Design a protein with these regions (language model features):
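Nucleotide-activated chemistry modules centered on ATP-dependent adenylation/adenylyltransferase
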Residues: 1-200
Length: 200
C-alpha cells in the first residue's frame, strides 16, 4: 500500500511543514493509510497489529493501543523479557543477519533514509555527516517550502539563549560545519506509529 507522495509533497499539499510536534508525513503516509486498509480489509477480532517498539520505547505502547483500537496491538520486543536495540542487534548477529546500515552509522532508527521531521539535532548531524547530498536535498526542499508558505518555519528549533526560534537546515549545516554547539542531547526518537496530539 502506498499513497504515492513523499513527505515533502505532503507538506506542500497541506501547506504545513512537519516538525517534532506534528508529523503530517507519518500521519498521512503511514498511520492513516494503514488505518484505512485495516478498516476495509480486516476484522478487529481476528487481526493483530504488530509494532516494532523496543524496550526503550515502552512509553509509546499505551498511546498506540488507544490509537489502533479496536484492533489488538502487540509489540513483541516489549514482551518478557523486553529487548532494546542492542539486544535485537545481538540476536541478529547470532542468526547471521546483517545490521541495518543506519543503525551501524549511529542512527537510532532505520527509516526514511535517516531523514525524519520528528528527529532532533543529533539525527540531522548524522544525516549531514554520512549523507551530505541527502541532507542538502532536504535543506533545499525546506527552503522551497518556506518561500511557498511565505513563513519563517523550519523543521528544527534553535534554543540558544533561552529563546526558541526556527533553525533552518541551511543554518544548521553552517553551524555544524563551523563546529558550533548543537543540541545533540535529546536523541532522535521516532514516533511514526504513535500519534501525538496535533494542532494541524
Amino acid at each position: 500500500m502506498a499513497d504515492g507522495r513523499d513527505p515533502w509533497q505532503v507538506f506542500f499539499d497541506r501547506r504545513f511543514l512537519g516538525n517534532t510536534r506534528v508529523d503530517l508525513c507519518s500521519r498521512i503516509l503511514k498511520r492513516e493509510l494503514l488505518r484505512d486498509w485495516l478498516d476495509r480489509e480486516c476484522e478487529p477480532g481476528a487481526t493483530t497489529v504488530y509494532l516494532g517498539f523496543d524496550g526503550d520505547e515502552a512509553a509509546r505502547m499505551a498511546r498506540a493501543a488507544t490509537y489502533w483500537a479496536p484492533w489488538t496491538v502487540r509489540a513483541p520486543l516489549l514482551e518478557d523479557p523486553p529487548m532494546d536495540k542492542d539486544d535485537v542487534r545481538d540476536l541478529m548477529r547470532m542468526v547471521g543477519l546483517k545490521e541495518p546500515r543506519l543503525y551501524a552509522l549511529g542512527f537510532k532508527h532505520n527509516n526514511c533514509g535517516g531523514f525524519c521531521v520528528k528527529a532532533g539535532h543529533e539525527q540531522f548531524q548524522l544525516l549531514l555527516k554520512h549523507f551530505p547530498e541527502r541532507f542538502d536535498a532536504h535543506a533545499r526542499r525546506e527552503q522551497e517550502l518556506r518561500v511557498f508558505l511565505g513563513k519563517d518555519v523550519a523543521i528544527l528549533r534553535d534554543r540558544r539563549g533561552g529563546r526558541m526560534r526556527p533553525l533552518t537546515l541551511v543554518e544548521f549545516r553552517r553551524r555544524a560545519l563551523a563546529n558550533e554547539q548543537l543540541d545533540c542531547f535529546g536523541g532522535s526518537d521516532c514516533a511514526c506509529f504513535t500519534p501525538e496530539p496535533e494542532t494541524a
